[in-house]
Amino acid sequence: MMQAKLINDITDIAWLSKAFDTDVKRRVFDDVTKEWITMEEVKKRYGNEGEKALKFFEKTRLVETRWMMKEGKAKKEYHAFYSSFHINVMSSIDVIRDVFSIVLMRDNEFKKIEEKIYDFIGEGELSREVERNFNLSPIQMKCIVKRSMKLEYKGMKIERFGES
């Protein structure tokens, strides 16, 4: 059953702004809305960009997964978990300023800071150490991690996404 995704954390705007920003992402999401689909099927239809889109949807929990037997092998299938968004946020100007400083950052600028943080954290680093090292507010750091396909939070640490 499809549900509405409640967004009440202003930093979620960071990932939401990137969820449907390309035609491929929109088409992949349309596909997972209609049916359960494997990563292989997405990659066959949309190439590497489709694969990245589906991984982003999984990271942001826009899709649910299940394991199914196909051709004698267990295959992970994906399906859209939400059919709508309910956005309800209230925020101070300072917080909104920090959120939009990351959300509106050009992709090439974002990739540079993302790569520097990725190199800095190694096996994982406390978020406050990363914030201190890169002169970022906690809100900016949270937005960077939510926008990124390379970083994720594990408790108080920032780690490399998909490597733990």
Identify the function of each model-found stretch.
Residues M1-W15, K59-E64, M69-S84:
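N-terminal leader segment of winged-helix/HTH proteins
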Residues M2-R26, M90-E115, Q140, G162-E163:
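Short alpha-helical segments that sit at the start of domains
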Residues K25-T33, K52, T65-E77:
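Long, charge-rich, low-complexity intrinsically disordered regions
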Residues E40-K43, E129-F134:
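Short alpha-helical "recognition helix" segments of helix-turn-helix
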Residues Y46-K59, F134-R147:
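Short amphipathic alpha-helical interaction segments
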Residues K59-M69, K146-R160:
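A short, conserved structural fragment
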Residues K70-L104:
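Conserved segment of winged-helix/HTH DNA-binding domains
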